[in-house]
Amino acid sequence: MDPDRQADIAALAATLTTVERVLDVDGLRDRIQKLEQEASDPNLWDDQSRAQKVTSELSHAQNELRRVEELRQRVEDLPVLYEMAAEEEGQDAENAGAEADAELAKLRVDIEAMEVRTLLSGEYDEREAVVTIRSGAGGVDAADWAEMLMRMYIRWAEQHDYPVEVFDTSYAEEAGIKSATFAVHAPYAYGTLSVEQGTHRLVRISPFDNQSRRQTSFADVEVLPVVETTDHIDVPETDLRVDVYRSSGPGGQSVNTTDSAVRLTHIPTGIVVTCQNEKSQLQNKVAAMRVLQAKLLARKKQEERAALDALKGDGGSSWGNQMRSYVLHPYQMVKDLRTEYEVGNPSAVLDGDIDGFLEAGIRWRNRRDDD
């Protein structure tokens, strides 16, 4: 085998060994065994919330272990592919060598993607995520853009078999949405999606302009970790104002004949949360409380960071505005303004193919935090 190929394979094997050590593969196997025992308990589904959490954790752990084991097998198989190519002659040898090179390149990409997972070591990175999208400047185009972003993230979650729970959708009058809040129920969803927080900018020919002029639209993405009992985010009833109303759909149409939608106002902070996608008022209140607790946790941590930055004499860093630009006209390009990562296929990106942006964002964040 070519010495350069041998060196490449050895480097990939070493990187994968590091990944296996950081992920604690033996500990992962033990965790799967315990979760399987818990999942087999016939009484588990008496607590729906707990059952869903256990099955979700089990599925994620099994998928993670399978990915690592498959990568290890591919690393071990790669020298065999090159040996088989060396035994061929003429065009067959050339084709077999090209196939081995293609597998080497793909394996490098897949191992690097797995390596990114080891960078998610923040305090809340392993949590599930609550995502809120709000339309910004740009009128009806901005509302449509916010809905396109919502679809992008939901498609990404579906491609990874991550359950999504939509808490609230506030529809705009003509098209699109004013805002939406949904949860992505998967381990490390927060650590992964938190790099998406910021302002997303769309440039395109407006489908709502009868003169077909180019329009720039903005939408803001907020990503919060799901609150757990260990976070001690208590909200006294005296701090809440609860309003109920009828759920509404596109164009302001009522989609429910009862006052099942809930609006919670946290009086001390003025934070307002709404939920209307559940079937009952009680379910909507519970879901709204989960989002409110996530927002209060984020506020608490933000205040702690601000105090620490003041002590350091550091203004702190922010994701800032326009963290990513999506251009559909006059050319086609999606570019992250922090990482410089870019893709010339906006259709694929808007259909949920954002792993490259997520991986680049996570690496960028870790480099920034190390500085």
UniProtKB/Swiss-Prot annotation:
SUPFAM superfamilies: Release factor. Pfam families: PCRF, RF-1. Methylated by PrmC. Methylation increases the termination efficiency of RF2. GO terms for cellular component: cytoplasm. InterPro entries: PCRF, Pep_chain_release_fac_I, Pep_chain_release_fac_I_sf, PrfB. Keywords: Cytoplasm, Methylation, Protein biosynthesis. PANTHER family: CLASS I PEPTIDE CHAIN RELEASE FACTOR, PEPTIDE CHAIN RELEASE FACTOR 2. This is Peptide chain release factor 2. It comes from Mycobacterium sp. (strain JLS).
